[in-house]
Amino acid sequence: MIGFLSDNLLIPILDFFYGLFHSYGIAIVALTIVIRIALFPLSAGSIRSARRMKIAQPVMQKRQAEIKSRYANDPKKQQDELGKLMGEFGSPLAGCLPLLVQMPILFALFATLRGSPFADVPYLVNLKILPPEQIAAVEPKPFKSPRHSIFISDKDHFPVIASLPGGTKIAAGDSVNIKLETLSGEKYSNVLGKFENGSKFSPTWKLTKGADLASVSADGTVTAKYPGDATVEGKIPGLAAKSGFLFIKALGQVGFYVDGAINWDIAILVAGFGLTLVISQVLSGQGMPPNPQQATAQKITPIMITGMFLFFPLPAGVLLYMVIANMFQAFQTFLLNKEALPENLQKILDDQIKNQGKKELATSPAIDSERLPFEPKSNKQN
């Protein structure tokens, strides 16, 4: 499904914007905004639900406990009352469905930006090399890799898969050829022959595991030597992997620290991701009473996630998408937080803010020293 959405929805939109602006960087920004706008109704539902549950949760938990205690011996009545409670405040799971519906599209968008034309495309084949006397008992199971859209030019691209008709289990001493082909079965090498620059997109093959157990030639032929596990990688260059955008040196560049040097464009993108994450988090808590139990987690989470992406091998094009998506999310949260709440939730929120103010006043160290003559004394014991 991810491949289908990428090939039939996202890449055509990408082609359209590249045709308009002749910049893959602008095309990424435009594609991200278009998809986020299209998903606005779904993501808005999740944000609204999360906002309402954040307000209603303390009251709901208290009333749920009361209902379960009061009707402990009457399960039917208990379920009826819990159902009424959900009807009043909504289900805590209501925001999950819109999120689940949009996830395939977001995963497809992520996969599109991790592949051609923005990055080199790897095809991995895991081989099981067996002793010759054991191979006769193995039933061949044809292998096909996930498909990837390969760009040969700005307008020419097609899905390509890697296949092994005889399967991934081979005998020591045998040789097999890993085939790259289109979905219609045409050899990838034949397709490249139709383009003047086709040779630039020829795959390179190497063993990433079990180099002492097998060898692989330039045409993808694997020769097994000894029993064991081996992994073969065929990599096709990305058309726009070396294209820059604004301060980004190459959209396909991966890694914050490579060969003893810092890639400052990656560092800026990761920092931008962290900053937009914090802004979105702050906006989501606007107008809400502070929650000391969640305060520490809210401070640490953005730092942990941002730090993780410093060392996670994501292409610069994907990081650009993540920054733009976070900016859109923050703007969306800002707009939705301006919406009026239902009357019952607004009353709960007002009470929570009022009670929070009373707690802060009661715990103030200057409360007794600044007490007016007509105010009652605090219960503080000397």
From Swiss-Prot:
Family matches, as CDD domains: 5TM_YidC_Alb3
Biased composition (Basic and acidic residues): 368-382
Keyword set includes Hydrolase: no
Membrane topology listed for this record: Multi-pass membrane protein
Residues covered by region (Disordered): 356-382
UniProt keyword terms in alphabetical order: Cell inner membrane, Cell membrane, Chaperone, Membrane, Protein transport, Transmembrane, Transmembrane helix, Transport
Coiled-coil residue spans: none
GO terms, biological process: protein insertion into membrane; protein transport
One Pfam family matching this protein: 60KD_IMP
Predominant localisation class: membrane
Example of a GO cellular component annotation carried by this entry: plasma membrane
Transmembrane segments: 20-42, 93-113, 260-280, 303-323
Role of this protein: Required for the insertion and/or proper folding and/or complex formation of integral membrane proteins into the membrane. Involved in integration of membrane proteins that insert both dependently and independently of the Sec translocase complex, as well as at least some lipoproteins. Aids folding of multispanning membrane proteins. Probably also aids protein insertion, folding and/or assembly of membrane complexes destined for the thylakoid.
PANTHER family, alphabetized: CYTOCHROME C OXIDASE ASSEMBLY PROTEIN COX18, MITOCHONDRIAL (PTHR12428:SF65), OXA1 (PTHR12428)
Protein name (Swiss-Prot/TrEMBL): Membrane protein insertase YidC
Species annotation: Prochlorococcus marinus (strain SARG / CCMP1375 / SS120)
The gene coding this protein: yidC
